[in-house]
C-alpha cells in the first residue's frame, strides 16, 4: 500500500508539473504538491469509494443471500456470526460490559467503515474544490464556494465513476464464485463443490 501511494504521489507530482509547465506556470515542490488539490482529490476520491464498498458489503451480507456464492451466508441455517454474543473470559471488553457498549460494538465494523467513508468523502470534496479553484485562479476566472461546488457535476462525476467500479468488482466476485474456483483461496468454494451449493 505504501509503495503504491508513494508511486501515485511521485507520478502525480510529475504529471501536475508537466501540465503547469505547459500552461507557463511555476512547478510545485514536493512539499507544495502534498497540499495541492490535485493530490488530495485523487487520493481521497479512491479511498472514499473503497470505504463505501466495504461498508455496504458488510451491511448487505448481513441479510442478503446468493445461492451458490462463496461470499454468501447459508440460505437455510444459522451461522456463528448470527448468534448473540456470550460474555466469557477472553471476550472483547464491550461484550463483557454489555449495555450500550455492546450495542455499538455489534455494529462497530460497519460504523468504522461509515466514518472512514465520511472522512474520505469530505477530504475528496475539499481536494476537488481546491483543485477546481486553483485552475480557475490560473485562468483568471471566478472561484466557487463549497456550497456552490457541492452541486457541481465535476465533483459527482469523480465520485460516481469510482463507486460504480467498486460495485462492479463486488458483484463480479459474488456471481463468478458460484461457478468458478480458486484452490486454496478462502474467497472460493471447494473445487469439487456443486455450483448450486452455498458453503
Question: Model segments located where?
Answer:
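Cytosolic juxtamembrane amphipathic/interface segments immediately preceding
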Residues: 88-102
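Charged/polar interaction segments and conserved charged motifs
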Residues: 1-16, 23, 89, 116
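Short, motif-level signal for alpha-helix interfacial/capping segments enriched in acidic residues
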Residues: 22-33, 79-80, 139-148, 152, ...
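Alpha-helical transmembrane segments and their helix-start/interface "positive-inside/aromatic belt" motifs
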Residues: 1-2, 55, 99-117
